[in-house]
Amino acid sequence: MNPFFKLLRVSLGHKVSFKNQISPDEWKRIYDTAKLHAVAGLLYVGIQRLPKELQPPTELMMEWFVLAKKIEQKNKFLNLRAVELTEKFRQDGFRSCILKGQGVARLYPNPYCRQSGDIDIWVEGGRKKVYRYLKGQIGQPLEMEFHHAQYPIFEDAEVEVHFIPANPQWPYSFWQVNRFTKSLEEEQFSHRVELPEGVGEIGVPTAAFDRIYSLAHIYKHFFSEGIGLRQIVDYYYILRQGFTEEERQETVKWLKRIRMYKFARAMMFVQHCVLGLEEQYLLCEPDTKEGNFLMKTIMQGGN
């Protein structure tokens, strides 16, 4: 296993031995790869667990520290914005659910090490009603696609308001995924959690929902923008929430129905053999051939 993936495993809490010191050039490659895949904050957690003699050169260590602090500060800021946005919709009569982003970051042992982007929020009410509300709030037409609209409510944080969580660009499976999300819709808008440091509550998906939704989102990236390791690590922590055998079978049933079971088996290989996810958290039997192909595709992509 190369040093990058060893460090990734250490960052995820696994015990890994480094037999040889890592050269300064190799550390630079690790840092660049971490930035490309938006996992630099997570890998900094791993670096802090290494003996001092195995850590990066001082100059790179300081650069990494500064980046990790910026990631931490942005997470804290977006947590506040997510709570503010959730409360704004609630006061105006709309229930909501934060997709990905800050909702997933809370699953990390260090919720501030995940590199965040914009705020994706699913708002109850349907496309016409929600768009009418958003347009009324801004006072002008919004940039909109079938399933979401850009909502420039903040100058310092991008917000996408989703009318439905399913993306019509998802290959093969849009209507089936939409059917799945519809079947669990009430639970998602009722599932609220407290964010770190008592900043407030947001709605987030249930584990049962996220096991399908997040994998479908990754699947869409597989055919379009490319997959980054941040998405793979997100799914690692989603799976580590655990499930009963009955819940696993229900998830597998839906994966087969929406024609993502083959992709799920490839993902289980990556989760188990690359990230070190324990067998008890795997949804199905890993597929080595498809998993190696998926891993190659991931490393050619990036966030």
For each feature predicted by the language model, list its residue ranges.
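Conserved NTP-donor binding/palm subdomain of two-metal-ion nucleotidyltransferases/polymerases, i.e.
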Residues: 1-117, 122-303
